[in-house]
Amino acid sequence: MFTVVSYLGILAAFALVTIGIFLVLRTIQLI
């Protein structure tokens, strides 16, 4: 069970990082 929670946590962190990079790239393109 702990492994599944850890896996979901890693996926969530990776998704947040990906969204953050995407937002930064969009902001750079808008400038």
Curated annotation (Swiss-Prot):
The GO biological-process annotations, alphabetized, read as: photosynthesis
The answer to whether UniProt assigns keyword ATP-binding to this entry is no
Q: Where are the transmembrane segments?
A: 4-24
Tell me where it mainly resides.
plastid
InterPro entries recorded for this chain? Answer: Cyt_b6/f_cplx_su6
State the UniProt keywords alphabetically. Chloroplast, Electron transport, Membrane, Photosynthesis, Plastid, Thylakoid, Transmembrane, Transmembrane helix, Transport
* Topology versus the membrane: Single-pass membrane protein
Entry annotated with the keyword Acyltransferase: no
Question: What GO MF annotations does this protein's record show?
Answer: electron transporter, transferring electrons within cytochrome b6/f complex of photosystem II activity
Question: Subunit structure of this entry?
Answer: The 4 large subunits of the cytochrome b6-f complex are cytochrome b6, subunit IV (17 kDa polypeptide, PetD), cytochrome f and the Rieske protein, while the 4 small subunits are PetG, PetL, PetM and PetN. The complex functions as a dimer.
Q: What does this protein do?
A: Component of the cytochrome b6-f complex, which mediates electron transfer between photosystem II (PSII) and photosystem I (PSI), cyclic electron flow around PSI, and state transitions. PetL is important for photoautotrophic growth as well as for electron transfer efficiency and stability of the cytochrome b6-f complex.
- Family stated for the protein in its record: Belongs to the PetL family.
Name used for this protein in its record: Cytochrome b6-f complex subunit 6
